[in-house]
C-alpha cells in the first residue's frame, strides 16, 4: 500500500474525547480499499487536534472515499465539535514499508518538513542511505515517511513512535552524536519544520 491520506481535525476545547467516540464508528464506514492505519490525539504542540491516517489500495479507492465523505452530511459525526478539517494526500517513500499495526508507542511524533523546490529527490536519497542505521539496534523504529502530492509542495511527513518522551530525547540525542542522523545533505533542502506529539485513540491500529 503506497497511497495515504492524513486528515487533521481541529476541535473545540474539551470536545476531543466525545469526538473520538463518534469517529470510532464513522471511520468504519469507509469504502472498500480504505484502511485505517492510525488515529491519534495531540498531546504536545497544537492541542485539540485529532490526526487520522488511512491507506488506500489505489488512487481510485482514495478518490471514491474522498468524494463519499465530502458529499455526505456530517460524514464523521463530529461536525458539532469541529473548527477545521485538513485533508492531505501522501505517497510512501519507495524504499520503506510501514510498521505493522500493534504497540509501538504510545507517543507518536508527526514531523512535517517543507522543502525548497528541488529538495525532494536529495531528501529521499539521504533518507534511503541513513534510515537503516537510524532505525537499527540501539536507536528506534520509524513508522514510515511520505511525500505530499497536493497542497504546499514539496513537503514530506515522517512518523516516529516512542515508548516515552525520555526515550525520544535519548535516541535523538545519541543519533546526532553518533553521526547516524540527520540524513546527509538534508539541511540545505529544508524551509520549515513542524512537529506534534500524539497519543493513540483506544481503537487506533497503531498503539
Model feature map: region roles:
Residues 165-179:
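Short cationic/low-complexity microdomains
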Residues 15, 55-61, 116-120, 161-167:
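Helix N-cap motif at beta-to-alpha junctions
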Residues 15-36, 67-78, 119-144, 175-185:
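Short amphipathic alpha-helical segments
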Residues 1-2, 10, 35-51, 71-107, ...:
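Glycine-rich beta-strand-turn "strand-cap" elements at beta-sheet edges
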Amino acid at each position: 500500500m503506497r497511497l495515504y491520506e492524513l486528515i487533521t481535525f481541529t476541535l473545540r476545547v474539551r470536545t476531543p474525547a466525545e469526538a473520538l467516540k463518534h469517529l470510532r464508528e464513522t471511520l468504519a464506514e469507509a469504502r472498500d480499499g480504505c484502511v485505517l492505519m492510525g488515529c491519534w490525539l495531540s498531546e504536545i504542540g497544537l492541542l485539540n487536534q485529532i490526526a487520522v491516517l488511512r491507506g488506500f489500495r489505489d488512487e481510485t479507492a482514495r478518490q471514491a472515499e474522498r468524494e463519499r465523505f465530502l458529499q455526505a452530511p456530517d460524514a464523521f459525526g463530529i461536525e458539532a465539535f469541529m473548527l477545521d478539517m485538513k485533508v492531505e494526500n501522501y505517497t510512501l517513500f519507495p524504499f520503506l514499508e510501514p510498521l505493522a499495526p500493534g504497540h509501538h508507542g504510545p507517543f507518536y511524533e508527526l514531523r512535517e518538513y517543507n522543502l525548497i523546490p528541488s529538495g525532494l529527490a536529495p531528501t529521499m536519497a539521504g533518507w534511503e542511505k541513513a534510515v537503516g542505521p537510524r532505525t537499527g539496534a540501539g536507536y528506534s523504529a520509524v513508522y514510515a515517511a511520505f511525500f505530499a502530492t497536493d497542497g504546499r509542495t514539496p513537503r514530506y511527513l515522517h512518523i516516529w513512535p516512542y515508548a516515552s518522551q525520555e526515550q525520544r530525547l535519548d535516541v535523538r540525542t545519541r543519533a546526532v552524536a553518533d553521526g547516524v542522523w540527520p540524513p546527509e545533505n538534508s539541511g540545505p533542502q529544508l524551509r520549515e519544520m513542524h512537529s506534534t506529539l500524539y497519543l493513540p485513540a483506544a481503537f487506533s491500529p497503531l498503539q
